[in-house]
Amino acid sequence: MFDILVYLFENYFDTGNYPDSATLTRKLTMAGFDDEEITLALDWLSEFSHHDTEGYLAGLAESNSMRHFTKEEMEIIDTEGRGFIFFLEQAGVINPLQRELLIDRVIRMDGDTSSVEKIKLVVLFDLWIQNQLADSNTIEKLFVVSDSHQRH
């Protein structure tokens, strides 16, 4: 699924939107992706674009409490990934509500790709869907700064 999401971002980012599900399925099949993986990716993307925050506490976006990861979350999101999420929140890229949505979305992804790669992709999709990637420097700032942060 990760490869499909990367493919979609790389091929549709510049256009600002992506085609309907049937067209995407056809194009992804022609690109050689597996039908089951296509379905998983498109379902994940559909859920992602709805920004359902109903199950989260009111006022979470303004919260300044410390987040502790559950055992299950720590099994899926490694130390580097958790550190990157903390970095994004401290840098003001995401608020606590966006952090929770990010964690949920990363957990819903499958595969053996590193957590940081998944997290970066989810953040890119979130910013893309919210039309916050209009400034091409946003991507560079996010990833250059985060990469230098992780080297320390």
From Swiss-Prot:
Q: State the InterPro entries in the record.
A: Smg
Please give the HAMAP family that the UniProt record associates with this protein. Smg (MF_00598)
Similarity comment: family membership: Belongs to the Smg family.
Q: What is this protein called?
A: Protein Smg homolog
